[in-house]
């Protein structure tokens, strides 16, 4: 413990340059932190807070935050054996005035997230609560549910393009956000998000009978794995197995390039979670969203 020190990095690029190889040792749990840091570096975001607890050169715990965003916590072991590192980093964060004022919430895998929350509450004199109970899932091999086999023959998976009805998918995106209790984007914001995803071949659609019936996103392609999100079927087309068939086909395609596929899901959404488990996703960690309550 005598060699423990908190190192603060000038910005997201310096943070990711220094820590990426060690963050990749637990890429599954660190995928959000890696991807957010890269995105903020690309966009030249300023004014955030990027810090790590180091023992010599060894990374023990880290976080990254940019104004207007959640703060993201790094991997912590399932047995909670890293409490000292979370305490040190929470106490350091509480001394950074602009971060204390600006951090409205954070996400971390448990039990580390709760340990950090308790330490930060005490040090900053603020209160936080779980906003969304989340779970992290991992898939390394696709299972094909019997009821999906016929649909897999009838359906086609492909990336959406500018020639597709992107306004339709923008409406689906709003429905997805509403379903997940996420901030509801405007029509213009939804069209922009869908257009951006399709321009880099990250929006995929499931076609049956020549018509799109479900959609999903590929997100955060990293060294070992990638993430999926945005799994959505409009209400009038549900209970036909479209999403399950799409996810089986989509994940099989992703595993041609990546070692694993991951996703973060609301623990309360039992229907979606059942779909994920049917095609081979296994829950690995609880990963909760916390928000300031006072």
Feature-to-residue mapping (PLM):
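Acyl-donor-binding surface of acyltransferase catalytic domains
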Residues: 58, 66-153, 290
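Acetyl-CoA-dependent GNAT
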Residues: 57, 64-70, 177-181, 188-229
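Residue-level recognition of the GNAT/N-acetyltransferase active site
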Residues: 78, 234, 238, 266
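Conserved donor-binding loop and adjoining core beta-sheet/short helix segment
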Residues: 2, 7-10, 21, 27, ...
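Conserved acetyl-CoA-binding loop-helix of GNAT-fold acetyltransferases
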Residues: 82-94, 233, 239-255, 273-278
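Conserved beta-strand-loop-alpha-helix junction that forms the acyl-donor binding cleft
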Residues: 107-113, 263-277, 289-294
């Amino acid at each position: 413990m005598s060699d423990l020190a908190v190192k603060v990095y000038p910005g997201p690029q310096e943070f990711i340059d220094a820590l990426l190889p060690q963050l990749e040792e637990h890429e599954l749990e660190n995928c959000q932190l890696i991807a957010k840091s890269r995105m903020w570096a690309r966009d030249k975001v300023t004014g955030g807070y990027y810090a790590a607890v180091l023992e010599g050169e060894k990374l023990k715990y880290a976080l990254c935050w940019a104004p207007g965003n959640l703060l993201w916590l790094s991997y912590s072991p399932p047995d909670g054996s890293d409490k000292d590192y979370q305490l040190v980093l929470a106490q350091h964060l509480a001394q950074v005035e602009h971060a204390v004022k600006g951090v409205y919430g954070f996400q971390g895998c448990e039990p580390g997230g709760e340990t950090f929350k308790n330490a930060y509450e005490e040090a900053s004199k603020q209160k936080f609560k779980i906003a969304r109970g989340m779970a992290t899932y991992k898939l390394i091999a696709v299972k094909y549910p019997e009821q999906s086999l016929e649909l897999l023959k009838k359906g086609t998976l492909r990336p959406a393009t500018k020639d597709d009805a992107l306004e339709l998918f923008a409406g689906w995106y709003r429905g997805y956000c509403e379903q997940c209790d996420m901030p509801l984007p405007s029509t213009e914001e939804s069209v922009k998000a869908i257009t951006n995803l399709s321009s880099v071949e990250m929006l995929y659609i499931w076609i049956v009978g020549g018509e799109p019936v479900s959609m999903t996103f590929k997100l955060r392609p990293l060294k070992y794995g990638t993430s999926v999100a945005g799994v959505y079927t409009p209400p009038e087309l549900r209970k036909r197995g479209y999403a399950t068939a799409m996810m089986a086909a989509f994940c099989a395609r992703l595993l041609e390039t990546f070692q694993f596929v991951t996703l973060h899901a609301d623990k309360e959404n039992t229907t979606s979670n059942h779909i994920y488990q049917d095609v081979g996703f296994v829950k690995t960690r609880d990963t909760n969203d916390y928000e300031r309550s006072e």
